[in-house]
């Protein structure tokens, strides 16, 4: 059914990500690294491509250079099939010297792209979440129900409703109310006293309906899908709620959390989502050959491990672990961990070094940091707050280049008997190397 429809995807990747500061001090939210070699934006793009949706515009805005470079290096599709593309679209200011004023305004400012492509359906998706989704199943639902607009939904706790667009439906999944980030708890969803139905920020529009709605919203000064466009369409159009819980992904293991979806818009949520991917039976398995999450081509050498103990950790390519201890650690590419250093529940980003005897726990080390020998981070939070960002739950974030790196290349420790890590170490399963 859905294969007969011409689908254009528009991914809204302009989010500033202020709640992820300082990780977003130099990059936009979709460009923030995730796991051993991915960025957050890779999840929505992989879902679209795996769903055989190959015509994708990526709308960017804030601090977008690293995202643009990532797309150029990782998501360049064939030049010989015109409708296969992932194209970055910065603000064009076609309607005046203004940046995007909201989600709907970002699409309106690029309305010419929709008009020239002439799709049947426009998929307007966010770029801020960790999940797998077969978008074709949502398209089938959209077509089967003669929907003008379909909104992907899932249950959230009532206490968290002020972070989401909340929908109310009738018995046939038609949306009868839509409130963006309500300040008072909404009515629970049918069959639950503790949860309401929330929008995932993923929408399907019939193209003609979307074009009319965007033009009308522009005339009235409305700029946001959740705040303005969707509530205004309730009486005049058929809006349907797609139940994300019904979405099935091939290759999902029985131990994985069904319908895993995480909004990683805060440091705490971002940190926890990493550890959902670790271990032999993770909540969310990064490797699935039937539904891969694509990453940039890896030109680095294999990781090298000499002695030390590694438990339930990821060691990125080009990294060196020399007689150190890793417990629930996530090392991205080209990280060096020197002898007698210890990392516990840590995320360490590219080209960082953990000096000899340093101890770090419950921390995120942004890229290009040279942690001094015998440094202690995460053990005295009051002292850490004077230097770093520390969340209410005690997660320490060391900003990019806080510890100015010296020449990482010239001081890389020599490992005469270095061994490449086994593949599973860089893909998320635990690895223990005995001394």
Swiss-Prot record:
It catalyses: alpha-D-glucose 1-phosphate + ATP + H(+) = ADP-alpha-D-glucose + diphosphate. InterPro entries: ADP-Glc_PPase, ADP_Glu_pyroP_CS, GlgC_bac, GlmU/GlgC-like_hexapep, NTP_transferase_dom, Nucleotide-diphossugar_trans, Trimer_LpxA-like_sf. Transmembrane segments: none annotated. Keywords: ATP-binding, Carbohydrate metabolism, Glycogen biosynthesis, Glycogen metabolism, Nucleotide-binding, Nucleotidyltransferase, Transferase. Its EC number is 2.7.7.27. The keyword Cell inner membrane does not apply. GO terms for biological process: glycogen biosynthetic process. The keyword Magnesium does not apply. Residues 408-435 are annotated as: Disordered. One of its GO terms (molecular function) is ATP binding. Pathway: Glycan biosynthesis; glycogen biosynthesis. Alpha-D-glucose 1-phosphate binds at residues 165, 180-181, 199. Involved in the biosynthesis of ADP-glucose, a building block required for the elongation reactions to produce glycogen. Catalyzes the reaction between ATP and alpha-D-glucose 1-phosphate (G1P) to produce pyrophosphate and ADP-Glc. Homotetramer. Belongs to the bacterial/plant glucose-1-phosphate adenylyltransferase family. PANTHER family: GLUCOSE-1-PHOSPHATE ADENYLYLTRANSFERASE (PTHR43523:SF2), GLUCOSE-1-PHOSPHATE ADENYLYLTRANSFERASE-RELATED (PTHR43523). This is Glucose-1-phosphate adenylyltransferase. It comes from Paracidovorax citrulli (strain AAC00-1).
């Amino acid at each position: 059914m859905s294969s007969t429809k011409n689908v254009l995807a528009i991914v809204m990747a302009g989010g500033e990500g202020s709640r992820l500061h300082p990780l977003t001090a130099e990059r936009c939210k979709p460009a923030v690294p995730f796991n051993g070699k991915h960025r957050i934006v890779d999840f929505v793009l992989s879902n679209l491509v795996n769903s055989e949706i190959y015509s994708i515009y990526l709308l960017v805005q804030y601090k977008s250079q690293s995202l643009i470079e990532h797309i150029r290096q990782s998501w360049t599709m064939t030049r010989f099939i015109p409708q296969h593309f992932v194209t970055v679209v910065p603000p064009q200011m076609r309607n005046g010297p203004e940046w995007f004023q909201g989600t709907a305004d970002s699409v309106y400012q690029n309305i010419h792209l929709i008009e020239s492509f002439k799709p049947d359906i426009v998929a307007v998706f966010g770029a801020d979440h960790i999940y797998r989704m077969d978008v074709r199943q949502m398209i089938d639902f959209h077509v089967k129900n003669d929907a003008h607009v379909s909104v992907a939904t899932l249950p959230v706790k009532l206490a968290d409703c002020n972070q989401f667009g909340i929908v109310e439906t009738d018995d046939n999944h038609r949306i009868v109310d839509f409130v963006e980030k309500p300040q008072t708890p909404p009515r629970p969803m049918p069959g639950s006293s503790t949860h309401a139905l929330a929008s995932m920020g993923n929408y399907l529009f019939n193209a003609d309906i979307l074009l009319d709605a965007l033009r009308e919203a522009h005339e009235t000064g409305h700029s946001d899908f959740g705040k303005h466009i969707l509530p205004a369409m309730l009486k005049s159009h058929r809006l349907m709620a797609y139940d994300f819980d019904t979405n099935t992904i091939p290759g999902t293991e029985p131990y994985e959390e069904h319908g895993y979806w995480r909004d990683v818009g805060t440091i705490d949520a971002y940190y926890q989502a990493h550890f959902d991917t670790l271990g032999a039976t993770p909540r969310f398995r990064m490797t699935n050959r039937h539904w891969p999450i694509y990453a940039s081509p890896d030109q680095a050498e294999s990781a090298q491990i000499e002695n030390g103990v590694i438990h339930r950790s990821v060691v990125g390519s080009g990294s060196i672990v020399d007689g150190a201890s890793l417990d629930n650690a996530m090392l991205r590419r080209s990280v060096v961990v020197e002898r007698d250093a210890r990392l516990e529940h840590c995320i360490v980003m590219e080209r960082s070094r953990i000096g000899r005897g340093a101890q770090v726990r419950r921390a995120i080390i942004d890229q290009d940091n040279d942690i001094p020998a015998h440094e202690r981070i995460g053990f005295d939070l009051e002292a850490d707050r004077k230097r770093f960002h520390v969340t209410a739950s005690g997660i320490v974030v060391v900003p990019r280049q806080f510890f100015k790196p010296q020449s990482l290349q010239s001081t890389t420790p020599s490992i005469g008997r270095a061994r490449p890590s086994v593949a599973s170490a860089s893909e998320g399963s635990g690895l223990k190397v005995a001394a």
